[in-house]
Amino acid sequence: MLTRKQYELLRFINERLKESGIPPSFDEMKDALDLRSKSGIHRLITALEERGFIRRLANRARAIEVIKLPEPALGSGGRRGFTPSVIEGNLGKARGPASFDESGEQPVAVPVMGRIAAGTPIEALQTRSHTISVPPDMLGAGEHYALEVRGDSMVEAGILDGDMALIQRSENADTGDIVVALIDEEEATLKRFRRRGASIALEPANTAYEVRILPPNRVRIQGKLIGLYRKY
């Protein structure tokens, strides 16, 4: 599994390689991740190498090769080509009705309904706490809400602890969708949905967690993930 910082560093290295063909220096990595020392970068690099995401080439300065990326960057999720859109920026509360985003369109106020477990299921949350502003072209049709992600079971799908998950309200899902699943009317969790014969599989995107296989009468879909709102 990847921590938030490991994921951010891997993405930064990959983007720099795509742009220039040259890996970033340790100082550049340190600044990009807002770390105080290069020792933290050394630890992150070692962790990524041990997990098989990168490879350091011997006897060459700044020689790092990206071997693989988490699922969204590969576009290889259960629903082919599906990658949640990510808004990076300030997770402030919704602005007033006269506010507009950079494109000139009025943002949509999406209610935040609490927290959702990307790990061990937590109790279902029904309380609306506040709203966040989201670009309208990210939402599409239908009713939407947001949930703050807690846990790391979906990290290899690019969903990190602390992200705000943007959910399209729906009672149905296709195989490969990442959904908000209500289990036994008590526990809510964010997982990838698949049908396995007469059963439903709720799959994590982290090998440290197990797939849950449940009968349909124990699972109720409450929405599908359409995007992420991430604060840096």
Curated annotation (Swiss-Prot):
Signal peptide: none annotated. The active site is at residues 153, 191. It comes from the Bacteria. Pfam families: LexA_DNA_bind, Peptidase_S24. SUPFAM superfamilies: LexA/Signal peptidase (SSF51306), Winged helix' DNA-binding domain (SSF46785). Keywords: Autocatalytic cleavage, DNA damage, DNA repair, DNA replication, DNA-binding, Hydrolase, Repressor, SOS response, Transcription, Transcription regulation. GO terms for biological process: DNA repair; DNA replication; negative regulation of DNA-templated transcription; proteolysis; SOS response. The record marks 118-119 as: Cleavage. One of its GO terms (molecular function) is serine-type endopeptidase activity. Residues 26-46 bind DNA. It catalyses: Hydrolysis of Ala-|-Gly bond in repressor LexA. Its EC number is 3.4.21.88. Belongs to the peptidase S24 family. NCBIfam families: lexA (TIGR00498). Represses a number of genes involved in the response to DNA damage (SOS response), including recA and lexA. In the presence of single-stranded DNA, RecA interacts with LexA causing an autocatalytic cleavage which disrupts the DNA-binding part of LexA, leading to derepression of the SOS regulon and eventually DNA repair. Homodimer. This is LexA repressor.
